[in-house]
Amino acid sequence: MQQYCISPQLNMISMKKVVLFLFFTSLFFSCKKEEVVPTDDNELITTVELIFTDANKKVSTFSFQDKDGDGKTPPEKFDKIVLDKNMSYSLEINVYDETKNPKANITEQIKLESDVHIFVFKIDPASLLSLKAIDKDKNGLPIGLLSSGSTQNVAGAGKLNLILKHQPPVNGKAVKTGNEAGGSSDIDLVFDLSVK
C-alpha cells in the first residue's frame, strides 16, 4: 500500500486558500440585496357595463367593449347613454378583461383594492345628470362602483366622461384622497349622453 505524505508547507498553503475562499464567499452571500417593491400595475379593462336603474325599477344597460384591449382596432361596442329627464337613478358599474378565457371580472379586483381605486364622473353640461358614489373604501373614501344621481327636468345632449383612477401609495404614502388627482387611469371613456 502506498502512502502519500503532504508537506506541512503545502498543507498550510491549501489551508490559506480554503480560508480565503470561505471569507470571500461569505462576503458575497452576506451582502444585502435591495428589497424589490412589487409594482401595482394598472388593470387591463376591455369591457365596461353601466347599469342604470330608475326610480320605477326600469333597468337600462349601456356598454363599452374593446376585446383586443390595446386600442389598435375600434371598439366592438360603444353605447350612447339615453336617460329620462326628471328621474332618479342608481348606477352600478361592472368591468371585465375579455382578453382572458374565461373573462376576468375586474370588478371584484377593484372591490378588493378599493383603497387605491376611484371612479370619477365628468358630465358636460353638468346640468344633464348628477352622479355621486355611494360605496366607500375602508378609509371612508368613495369608490364609485355604486352611485346614485338624477337628471333634471330639461332634455338635452352631452357627454359622460367615465374615469377609473388607479392610485396606489407612493413611497408608503397614500395617494387616494377621494378626488381625481394623483395616480393613473385604468379607464378614460367618453360616452355620448342623451336625456329625453
Q: What name fits each language-model region?
A:
Residues I123-K196:
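Helix-rich interaction surfaces within compact, conserved domain-sized segments
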Residues D97-N105, Q167-A174:
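Short acidic/polar inter-strand loop motif in beta-rich domains
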Residues M1-F29:
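Sec-dependent bacterial lipoprotein signal peptides
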Residues K58-D84:
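N-terminal edge beta-strand
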Residues K100-L128:
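Structured interaction patches on ligand/partner-binding surfaces of diverse proteins
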Residues S26-L50:
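Bacterial Sec-dependent N-terminal signal peptides
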Residues P38-T39, F78-K85, T151-Q152:
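Short, solvent-exposed beta-strand/turn "edge" segments of beta-rich domains on protein surfaces
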Residues M87-L91:
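Short beta-strand segments enriched for Tyr within beta-sheet-rich domains
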